């Protein structure tokens, strides 16, 4: 497979769109035709988008390994096949999108899955490529519903979690949504709240404009100016998704590059130089598309109660944009491999955080709790041959030699060396101890510093955000409850050493079901009563620690 002339080339979707606009319509039309085809397949067809999208979370049809266990077994909760927060995150998703691409090729031979180049100049300035947000597309002389815009469920979905309030269940005919809309329709109360919220946003074109403004804000980081971070800018840009993607390419080894659990611990163990895992900017894009806004957007404002499907692991892969996003994540994985000499070999640090099936999200079907994860762990449910052997990470290290595809030109092919911020502190802020089990799904931690001047007036500095892509009811996974700690690190190099010493630090948490950002009291370690009321059945309270380290 190594001959470049035989490789399938995954191109930027924006390049396909530009080629279409210049008159060469076939590549983009073939892509649309293939996506239309897999969405129209019967829902029990293994190539159907319903089946493929469901591997990541709902509809949970393939859970025999779990359902056969006694109801009181700690392993009975299952949230899908996907791997997050562990060393299998990049490789599992590599095979996942390959299977989606193979389904597309069964409809239109030769078509490849393009990537959404999330760090390109066009994306940073304009947001999502138009073909992914256009409601209709002309194909074969007919104006059809664009299959890249959304997906309409042919069957209802259920998360099958005992005692859940079913807010994330979806009926047949449900159409996936993105920011600023809400897709919570599982209960009468949720449907009423969603109808009221979505009625505020009746215009798809204006909704896309809001979505793109949100994406751009996340890419840059907060702040109204267009400059990079400085020691005197109270709302610096430069700590957004684009910066995170650039930063992750310098991760020193596969273990910490691969996932947020390993990277979080690595930053505690190696405080002199922080790392960013590939999974972190990946999480941010999920939440940006799926309903979370970011401070400092100016006139676009902040849309409370948005609940897009991309913002929750259970439903994310049912939005077609998921696969264009993950194609870019896989491209970044390949760029890291090429730029750091790991094209043919990856290594996992045995016994490190993020190398156990119980870390972060908990185990997936067929992988018992407490199982060490390595490059030979099966990437279920994906089968590689006629003998029923599962794919492992060893089968997908070199995408050109082993899988027969490569990537066309894109941003960060030659990653720029970030210019150091002169005069800033070398310290970082560490927030830890927050339990994901307290939250119904994904949430965002945001860190701030307040510094008094000589007159006692406070200046607020926004330090950055840490997105946590999660799923509802992780607390139902009894085995996972001791593995739900979130560790977040925020560089303080936009503050001078003097300001770092004077500052008071605090965080806010934006989460589902709460329209306000809550300032969490550092002294008591407790949140506002509103959060506790949502999960009153939990005996514990939201607590965390903040520390400034060298």
UniProtKB/Swiss-Prot annotation:
Organism classification: Bacteria, Pseudomonadati, Pseudomonadota, Gammaproteobacteria, Oceanospirillales
Catalysed reactions listed for this entry: L-tyrosine + O2 = L-dopaquinone + H2O; 2 L-tyrosine + O2 = 2 L-dopa; 2 L-dopa + O2 = 2 L-dopaquinone + 2 H2O
Top-level EC class as recorded in UniProt: oxidoreductase
Keyword tags: Copper, Metal-binding, Oxidoreductase
Cofactor mode of binding and number, as noted: Binds 2 copper ions per subunit.
EC assignment: 1.14.18.1
Record PANTHER family: SHKT DOMAIN-CONTAINING PROTEIN, TYROSINASE FAMILY MEMBER
Family: Belongs to the tyrosinase family.
Bilayer-crossing regions: none
Effect of pH on activity: Optimum pH is between 4.5 and 6. Exhibits a rather narrow pH range of activity (over 50% of activity between pH 4 and 7) and no detectable activity above pH 8.
Binding positions for Cu cation B per the UniProt entry: 282, 286, 326
UniProt temperature dependence: Optimum temperature is approximately 40 degrees Celsius. Activity goes below 50% under 25 degrees Celsius and past 45 degrees Celsius, and the enzyme no longer exhibits activity at 72 degrees Celsius.
Domains as described in the record: Contains a C-terminal lid-domain (LID), which is not cleaved and is essential for activity and stability.
A single MF term (Gene Ontology): metal ion binding
Cofactors, names only: Cu(2+)
Disulfide pairings: none
Residues that hold Cu cation A according to the record: 56, 84, 93
PROSITE patterns: TYROSINASE_2
Name of the featured protein: Tyrosinase HcTyr2
Cited function: Copper-containing oxidase that catalyzes the conversion of L-tyrosine to L-dopa and then to L-dopaquinone. Can use various phenols such as p-coumaric acid, phenol, pyrocatechol, syringol or pyrogallol. Accepts several of the constituents of lignin and potentially participates in lignin functionalization.
């Amino acid at each position: 497979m190594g001959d470049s002339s035989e490789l399938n080339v995954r191109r930027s979707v924006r390049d396909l769109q530009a080629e279409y606009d210049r008159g060469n319509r076939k590549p983009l039309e073939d892509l649309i035709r293939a996506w239309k085809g897999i969405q129209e397949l019967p829902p029990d067809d293994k190539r159907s988008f319903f089946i493929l999208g469901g591997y990541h979370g709902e509809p949970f049809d393939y859970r025999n390994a779990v359902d056969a266990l006694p109801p009181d077994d700690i392993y009975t909760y299952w949230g899908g096949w996907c791997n997050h927060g562990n060393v299998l995150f990049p490789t599992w998703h590599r095979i996942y999108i390959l299977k989606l691409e193979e389904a597309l090729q069964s409809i239109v031979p030769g078509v490849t899955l393009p990537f959404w180049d999330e760090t390109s100049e066009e994306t940073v300035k304009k947001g999502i490529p138009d073909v992914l947000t256009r409601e209709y597309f002309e194909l074969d002389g007919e104006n059809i519903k664009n299959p890249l815009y959304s997906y309409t469920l042919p069957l209802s979905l259920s998360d099958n979690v005992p005692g859940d309030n079913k807010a994330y269940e979806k009926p047949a005919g449900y159409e996936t949504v993105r920011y600023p809309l809400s897709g919570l329709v599982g209960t009468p109360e949720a449907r009423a709240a969603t109808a009221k919220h979505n009625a505020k946003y009746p215009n798809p074109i204006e909704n896309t404009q809001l979505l793109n403004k949100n994406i751009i804000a996340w890419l840059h980081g907060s702040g109204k100016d267009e400059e990079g971070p400085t020691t005197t800018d109270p709302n610096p840009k430069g700590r957004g998704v684009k910066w995170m993607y650039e930063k992750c390419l310098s991760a020193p080894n596969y273990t910490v590059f691969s996932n947020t659990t390993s990277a979080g611990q690595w930053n505690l163990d190696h405080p002199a130089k922080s790392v960013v895992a590939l999974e972190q900017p990946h999480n941010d894009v999920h939440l940006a598309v799926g309903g979370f806004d970011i401070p400092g957007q100016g006139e676009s404002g902040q849309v409370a109660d948005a609940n897009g499907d991309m913002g929750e692991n259970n439903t994310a892969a049912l939005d077609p944009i998921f696969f264009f996003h993950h194609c870019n994540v896989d491209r970044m994985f390949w760029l890291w491999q090429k730029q750091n000499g790991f094209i043919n070999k990856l290594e996992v640090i045995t016994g490190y955080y993020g190398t156990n099936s119980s870390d972060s999200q908990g185990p997936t079907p067929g992988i018992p709790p407490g199982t060490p994860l390595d490059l030979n762990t099966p990437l279920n449910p994906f089968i590689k041959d006629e003998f029923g052997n599962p794919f492992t990470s060893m089968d997908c290290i070199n995408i050109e030699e082993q899988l027969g595809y490569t990537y066309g030109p894109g941003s960060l092919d030659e990653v720029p060396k970030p210019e150091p911020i002169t005069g800033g502190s070398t310290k970082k802020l560490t927030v830890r101890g927050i339990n994901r089990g307290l939250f119904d799904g994904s949430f965002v931690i945001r860190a701030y510093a307040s510094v008094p001047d000589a007159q006692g007036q406070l200046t607020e500095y926004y330090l950055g955000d840490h997105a946590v892509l999660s799923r509802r009811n992780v607390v139902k996974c009894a085995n996972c409850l001791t593995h739900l700690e979130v560790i977040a690190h925020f560089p303080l190099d936009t503050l001078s050493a003097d300001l770092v010493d004077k500052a008071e630090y605090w965080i806010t948490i934006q989460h589902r079901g709460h329209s306000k950002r809550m300032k969490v009291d550092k002294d008591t370690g407790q949140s506002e009563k509103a959060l506790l009321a949502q999960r009153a059945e939990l005996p514990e309270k939201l607590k965390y620690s903040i520390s400034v380290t060298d």
